[in-house]
């Protein structure tokens, strides 16, 4: 869990000094991420992924933009776990995990609605935004590393900060 949940919800109130709680309430959390888990119809190596991890960024982009959550400017981390461990996919196939910094407040909480319980409701607009973001990332990966990546995708799943919040209850999906 995140530090806010730990100190303010899980531990007994008397276990954490008030001064520490105040300090923590002012701390800035690290971004969450948008994660694209990809199943390939070929090996990752055959598409040019020779290393287990690849980091894509533009030297001319400011560091603050690299972590901004903007799908056009944020850095991209690509993990190709099947480069090292062939047992993670059927023979002749591969996987990629693509990570991009993302923030919960992006596009009005990813175009979700909040219900009476305070839960994020994933709308059709949310699903469309998630897909649009993923396609921008695929386009960038194709430009910089693998020109025909989308032709080799069997399946992919996209997780946003909303997804991480849903399953972990971490503040802002961080």
Give the predicted meaning of each segment.
Residues 38, 98, 141:
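Hydrophobic, well-ordered secondary-structure elements that form the walls
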Residues 77-79, 138-139, 143-174:
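A glycine-rich dinucleotide-binding beta-alpha-beta segment and adjacent secondary-structure elements
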Residues 74, 86-136:
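Glycine-rich, aromatic-lined ligand/substrate-binding cores of catalytic
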Residues 12-14, 113-115, 155:
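Short Gly/aromatic-enriched secondary-structure transition segments
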Residues 6-9, 101, 136, 140-144:
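Generic, well-ordered alpha-helical scaffold segments in large soluble proteins
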Residues 59, 83, 103, 158-160:
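Residues that form or immediately flank small-molecule/cofactor binding pockets and catalytic motifs
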Residues 1-91:
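Mid-domain catalytic core of redox enzymes
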